[in-house]
Amino acid sequence: MGGEQEEERFDGMLLAMAQQHEGGVQELVNTFFSFLRRKTDFFIGGEEGMAEKLITQTFNHHNQLAQKARREKRARQETERREKAERAARLAKEAKAETPGPQIKELTDEEAERLQLEIDQKKDAENHEVQLKNGSLDSPGKQDAEEEEDEEDEKDKGKLKPNLGNGADLPNYRWTQTLSELDLAVPFRVSFRLKGKDVVVDIQRRHLRVGLKGQAPVIDGELYNEVKVEESSWLIEDGKVVTVHLEKINKMEWWNRLVTSDPEINTKKINPENSKLSDLDSETRSMVEKMMYDQRQKSMGLPTSDEQKKQEILKKFMDQHPEMDFSKAKFN
């Protein structure tokens, strides 16, 4: 049997022919055997039974290949499903532990008083932190942080620092991302186990809505960028947390927010090492590794890979021309 390239040689012609058969594969096969009967001696040219034997052998060969391809596809899908489920479970567990979730039950006076006290304490802590940053309070050990803040671009000031998953921990939900996908966990504090009929999850190419039926949605906005709806999914973890998995269309981009109404994260502080490089193809992986290297070099004030190449070329040129004086030369 021929190789894959040989097999695909006539695909264009056969596809055009198949498209003209309204009866589908059955009509196409009938046309092919009609051609063999009318234009060749396939059925009568050899020994008795040879034509049938050839047909059976050919069918068995391609049937085995088709069954093998189907098994491999199912195995890949099962592996991907299991990995997504494990990732969603881990994210849900973290969200359940770290995020209080939206309150949908009526608070007692005691709970309301305690909640207000926590809010006031948080505001005091934030004001204290602002004073430290503005220099109105002296704080030992803050010099390095202040220097780092000074070095930050003006346009990046005020942006959130990414969480360990290169996303954001927000009051009502948290999300993480890799270059190719994004995972979201929305915890709900309810007195019953959530079921599919209790929640509303609507994933569109550029819009996402998540919430409980009869309640205002927790998320209802335009996504930062487009996603593959057919490869995205959602499920309920532990009866309390809704997790959503989104497949990005642009797999060479870090999102700075989930939906456009969210606060931005500083993508310059993203750590690509937290992403699964093993999931990327070789070309994309090499590009990401280069990005990681250049990011580390910049953070240490060292030249990037491109700058190093330029320096090496310049050094070779200078070594080859010792008679030239480069002491007053300026290089960009």
Swiss-Prot record:
The modification N6-acetyllysine is found at K240. Residues 174-332 are annotated as: Interaction with EML4. Ubiquitous. Detected in stomach, small intestine, spleen, liver, kidney, brain, heart and lung. Keywords: Acetylation, Cell cycle, Cell division, Coiled coil, Cytoplasm, Cytoskeleton, Microtubule, Mitosis, Nucleus, Phosphoprotein. Residues 145-154 have a biased composition (Acidic residues). GO terms for molecular function: unfolded protein binding. GO terms for biological process: cell division; mitotic metaphase chromosome alignment; mitotic spindle organization; nuclear migration; protein folding; response to peptide hormone. Induction: Up-regulated by prolactin in T-cell lymphoma. Maximum level of expression occurs at the G1/S phase transition of the cell cycle. Its main location: cytoplasm. It is found in: Cytoplasm, Cytoskeleton; Nucleus; Cytoplasm, Cytoskeleton, Spindle; Midbody. A motif (Nuclear localization signal) lies at residues 68-74. SUPFAM superfamilies: HSP20-like chaperones (SSF49764). GO terms for cellular component: cytoplasm; cytosol; microtubule; midbody; mitotic spindle; nucleus. Plays a role in neurogenesis and neuronal migration. Necessary for correct formation of mitotic spindles and chromosome separation during mitosis. Necessary for cytokinesis and cell proliferation. Belongs to the nudC family. This is Nuclear migration protein nudC.
